[in-house]
Each structure stands twice: as structure tokens, then as C-alpha cells.
């Protein structure tokens, strides 16, 4: 009977920005537990620009949750998606492992100029909104030109966080939502960089499960989902 139920379960495929990894997993679990009919939700995490390209090329997703508003709007303009919506506001954080001698909480972005810092991880600005936001704050602070040769680029913001966790970089500019995740919480020191990334989504035009996609989009706006997002620093205003 269980095998039959799984076989008959509706399926929802979500293309989601990497900063959502832990928050969205919690939201999916909460949503799935409330369903009366079998529902299989499959999130695929990556850089928003890469997911955007996959959807353009026909990847079978139902919902796109980007780390910006640009990519969803471009999909809609190209006829690949409909029904734009805002669901979160992301923030940048400067993060170092607990073992680092850098006092990032006190020094903030000036930590990046410390002589001990040889590699600084950011997400690739070519296709990751968090990478573009990192470059923007570095330029605004007037230190981008000084540290540009020290930058190492992660494929997405989650990989960027891994670089710093594993010693591939001395310090990283990553998503606050990842800093607050179970795998990073209490394992490092961070400075929240004044920033805000409006994060938007859309329903993919080719979705074969539009009604299910619309229901999940509705849940993202619920008090329960907003509470989960807020716990990861992703509260929308």
C-alpha cells in the first residue's frame, strides 16, 4: 500500500537559490506534514543564474525561487514563467571559523584588509545574486580594488560557505541564512553586513502541476513559513 501511495503522489519540483537550502527544507517538511494527499516535493538548489538558464532550456521545474527579482522577471518576459511574487529578504554576512583570530564582529569589512587574510570567498557574481551583492558592498566600502586579487569564487553561495568552513578561504561573504543554519550556527564568528536582497519567485509556465505550485506559493506567504524564514534572517518586510 505504501509503495502504491508513493507511486501516486503528486510531485512538485522547486528550483531554489542556494541561500534557501536549510530554510526551504524546513518549510517543505512543514507543508508536507499538513497535506492529506501524498505529495513529493523535490528542491534543486543552485545559483539563481544557473537555475534561470536551466528553466530557459526546458528543465522540468514547477516553481522558481530566486535570490533576486531580476531572474524571475526575465523568465516572465521571455514567456517561461508567470505570477511573480516576493517571498523573502536576504542579507549578507562576513563569516570566519571560530578558530580564526580575526575579530570580525568588531572590525566588520575592515577585517578583509588584515595581512593574515589571503583568500576571500564570495559567490560568483556572474550568476549568483549574493556574489553581485558582495561586490557591491565591497565597492561601496571602497576596498574592492584592494582585495580583488584575493577573491575566490564559489559556484553558488552555499559552496562559498563551504570554502571557508573547509579552509579553502580565510573569510567569506555569504548569506546570513546559511550562518544561521544548523551546520554553521555556533561554529564561527560573523558580522552582518548592512544589505538587503529582495528575493522573488515565479511559477514556471511549463509546469504540469500548476495548482499544486500555486498552493505551495500560497504557503510561502503563510505565518508558519514566514516564521521559518525569519529564523534564518530571511524575513520579508
PLM feature segments, named:
Residues 1-5:
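Bacterial N-terminal signal peptides
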Residues 9-36, 40-45, 49-59, 66-69, ...:
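Exported/periplasmic ABC-transporter solute-binding proteins
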